[in-house]
Amino acid sequence: MAYYITGDCHAHFEKLIWLARFNKELGKEDVIILLGDVGLNYFGADKDREKKILADFPNYFLCVQGNHEERPYHIQTYRTQIWNGGEVYYEPEFPNIVFAKDGEIYDFDGKKAIAIGGAYSRDKEYRLLTGLPWFPDEQPNDEVKSRVENKLNEVDLKIDYVFSHTCPLVYRPSQKSVINFEKIDLSTEEWMDEIAKKLDYSQWYFGHYHDNIQYINAQLLYEEIKELGEPDSVQKVGRPRYRVGEMVYFTFGKEDAREGYGTVEWVDDYGTLGQEKEVSYDIVGIPCELPGEKTLFKHIREYKIQSID
């Protein structure tokens, strides 16, 4: 069995379809962990197209609670059961889709993981003005926080993984360009920060911020899909980071031992190279150690490239 983990989907499941179609043969014992804002309970409907898409997968989905979705215990079709050692919410019609209960600890081949869902919606005022769904209990309340803290105390503040939607303040990406940045409620992040200072953990996985960032002991995931506990990407399907005409520095050759710089000539669309883990680029450039005429370097993967400011 295998365990994969990725960030927000917002009902766009192309990255999961690519994973199953091109990169991994998924089985009924495999699990994909989705770190909130999955897009299944956004309207609170008990039957919708998105659930049926995921129900067609052979594997399990463990969904962490996001801020843009109704909590399962408010929806009549959900039941509870014990799954991988912890309590989850599920619908009998879609048994392979389970929602983690905040504060529950789950077992993944001997590795323990705790789930902590919820976050503040930075667009809360806009949603209230326009009538878009907004959920008053989007952030963990005092009861949830106590449950999380008690569970962690039961394991002597030692856990392998944390699965959350938002993150401790120390890992929070800067968002000063966001309108009304100073009005964002950071109480959940501050609470998580106090937990992180005391907790002995291997990796803290989170989503919410729509980016992919690797920290020493934490990972922010969005388009990127990783195997649980592993540093390398299984797949990264999403926005190309670089554009045609942009100047970049890149590595190439055996073990990426050679360096070059040049201009992006072509972006290989996702699906053009379906067997690849992430987007790649054709670059017209020059090797750093042997300046001369420009050469076309084909299919340079995104992780080998850096922008030249």
For the regions a language model picked out, list residue spans one by one.
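Beta-strand-turn-beta hairpins that frame and shape the catalytic cleft
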Residues: 1-4, 105-115, 161, 215-220
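Short beta-strand-centered aromatic/proline hotspots
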Residues: 258-270
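Active-site environment of divalent metal-dependent phosphoester hydrolases
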Residues: 10-14, 39-44, 67-74, 105-106, ...
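Intrinsically disordered, low-complexity, charged/polar segments
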Residues: 280-309
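Core catalytic region of metal-dependent phosphoesterases/phosphodiesterases
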Residues: 2, 6, 11-108, 181-182, ...
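Mixed-charge, Lys/Arg-rich low-complexity intrinsically disordered regions
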Residues: 235-248
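Conserved beta-sheet core of the metallophosphoesterase superfamily
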Residues: 62-64, 82-84, 169-234
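Active-site-proximal loop/helix segment associated with metal-binding centers of metalloenzymes
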Residues: 86, 95, 111-186
